[in-house]
Regions:
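Conserved acidic residues
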Residues: 89, 168, 391
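Glycine- and acidic
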Residues: 59-64, 91, 185-190, 412-420
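Structural motif
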Residues: 3-6, 10, 194-198, 425-426, ...
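Signature of N6-adenine DNA methyltransferases within the class I
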Residues: 70-77, 95-106, 121-124, 132-138, ...
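Short active-site oxyanion
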Residues: 124-128, 417
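Short, well-structured alpha-helical interface segments that form or flank functional binding sites
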Residues: 64, 73, 100, 198, ...
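Class I S-adenosyl-L-methionine
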Residues: 1-120, 128-143, 458-502
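C-terminal substrate-recognition regions of SAM-dependent nucleic acid methyltransferases
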Residues: 255-493
Length: 504
């Protein structure tokens, strides 16, 4: 029996031991054969996944190491992003796990080469796999053989000398968190004080700064939070202004959850970037066209967020708005959007209106059974934010749902609600109508980066469309689609993302 790991009693690794032993006996493979060539040499990629892929891993592995096994469809997608080169690049798998990504890379490279033993050994020699979990590294040595470099270490403590030992490609699905999971809004049972540590940004930084050669490629599957542009870590700025994005493909939290069989819930992106230079445009995957299209990064000083669904319809909307801005010499500045904050501690709330709690506030907005938007209210002993101001309130966490408060009757008692202040009744009604259209809802969807919450980045494109000089038609969706020069196919796609219908 070939022992994998120090703790053979661990169920997962005991199964792997049995699987390896059975396969070797069935195919008359000796230990020397496997040690020299690696077990992967004797397996097809499909066989490798059927033997070793486990969609569900232990809670300890997931929370302590941040380990998640990457499904084959996603791995193939990542490998397809890599440039085709005649020479064999040096490749680093930064958090190898059980070697799924490296195995797919090696087999893909092998299939496009002369299938000689020498070529296989050369591919293996070009690979370096780093993995913190020692049980996994034992299995990696068995799978990849003695020609590959397998390092049992923390990737963030790995510092190769770039001039001699740098890598042409760094690839991987880095751990998102380690030492415990990160609390998300939907998890009501976890205390944020018990949070683990988010490390995926550090993996990106470390790969670029300390592992890649100049003009080397980074191919990662990571959360897409950096794409909205206001990340405190500065990753958006670093990626776009110090490196060149080659292509990206975004995945919604629902699609990610589907890929990982219910073991993921994060909006993610596969990104291929090239070290050095500056990003001016890149290939952006359109879920509308099911293909890549060119995305131009130069959207003006107020536009930094990168869309997630597609850039084709977004480009048409942007082109139309920019043309009327240029024609009439209007401001390119987005309409002013205010995001509510947490109430001061001195403000107390009640579900009932009393003499001590006279001020009425909006908590949130919801859909009623008949499809009309309804509001949940409470009362406070002090006026809450925006009380007394004429405004448009977007109180629904996912869709906004424009609510007019022309008299300024309501305050806002919850954080993360969006407010537009405007005294002109006609203009604010026009904006309210526009923000309830399928087109506006689609644009909101195109700029969502965490769960399904409405983001402030989703308003960067929104200029003051109520300005009569712009000439936008109000009250007629078909006329609006025509004004933006959308095709019937465009319109159909936009409508499919309108999950709720609004009533005047």
């Amino acid at each position: 029996m070939i022992v994998i790991g120090d703790v053979v009693s661990d169920t997962t690794y005991a199964i792997f031991n049995e699987t390896v032993t059975t396969y070797m006996n069935t195919n008359a493979l000796s230990t020397d054969d496997v040690r020299e060539m690696g077990l992967l040499y004797y397996l097809t990629l499909t066989d490798f996944y059927s033997l070793f892929y486990k969609p569900v891993i232990s809670t300890h592995q997931k929370e302590y190491y941040g380990e998640v096994n990457t499904p084959l469809d996603l791995v193939k997608e990542m490998i397809s992003f890599l440039p085709i080169t005649s020479s064999l690049p040096k490749v680093l798998d930064s958090g190898a796990g059980l070697g799924y990504i490296s195995a797919c890379y090696a087999k893909t490279r092998w299939e496009t080469s002369n299938k000689t033993i020498e070529n296989w050994k050369a591919i293996m020699t070009s690979l370096t796999l780093i993995e913190l979990n020692s049980n996994n590294t034992d299995l990696l040595r068995l799978l990849f053989g003695i020609n590959s470099t397998i390092i049992n270490s923390d990737f963030l403590q790995y510092f190769p000398k770039l001039s001699t030992d740098g890598y042409d490609i760094v690839l991987g699905n880095p751990p998102f968190n380690i030492n415990g999971s990160i609390k998300v809004p939907t998890n009501k049972n976890k205390n944020k004080k018990d949070d683990g540590r988010s490390v995926w940004r550090e993996f990106v930084d470390h790969s670029i700064d300390h592992c890649l050669t100049e003009d080397g490629y980074l191919c990662y599957f990571i959360p897409n939070l950096w794409m909205k542009g206001n990340d405190k870590a500065g990753l958006h700025t670093k990626i776009l202004t110090q490196n060149r994005i080659v292509k990206i493909k975004c995945y919604s939290n629902h699609y990610t959850n589907h890929l990982f069989k219910g073991n993921a819930q994060t909006h993610c992106v596969v990104i291929l970037l090239q070290k050095g230079g500056i990003t001016t445009s890149f290939e952006h995957f359109s879920w509308y066209l099911k293909s890549f299209s060119r995305y131009d990064c130069d959207k003006g000083e107020y536009r930094v967020a990168i869309p997630v669904l597609d850039s084709v319809i977004e480009n048409k909307i942007n082109t139309k708005l920019q043309s009327v801005i240029s024609k009439h010499q209007l401001s390119n500045c987005p309409i002013s959007i205010y995001k509510t904050s947490t109430l001061p501690k001195r403000t107390n709330l009640s579900v009932y209106k009393t003499q001590d709690y006279p001020f009425q506030n909006i908590k949130t907005c919801r859909f009623t059974a008949n499809g009309y938007p309804g509001i949940d209210v409470d009362y406070s002993d002090h006026p809450c934010q925006f009380n007394g101001e004429p405004k448009l309130i977007l109180a629904h966490g996912m869709y906004g749902i424009p609510l007019l408060d022309i008299d300024g009757h309501y305050g806002i008692s919850r954080r993360d609600k969006y407010i537009i202040l405007m005294k002109d009744v006609v203009n604010i009604k026009n904006i309210a109508w526009f923000l309830s259209t399928p087109l506006a809802l689609y644009m909101f969807e195109n700029y969502k980066y965490r769960m399904c919450y409405l983001e402030k980045a989703g308003f960067e494109w929104l200029i003051d469309v109520s300005n009569p000089k712009i000439g936008m038609p109000f009250g007629d969706n078909n006329a609006l689609f025509k004004w933006f020069n959308l095709t019937e196919s465009d319109i159909d796609y936009v409508k499919r993302f309108t999950r709720k219908q609004f009533t005047d």
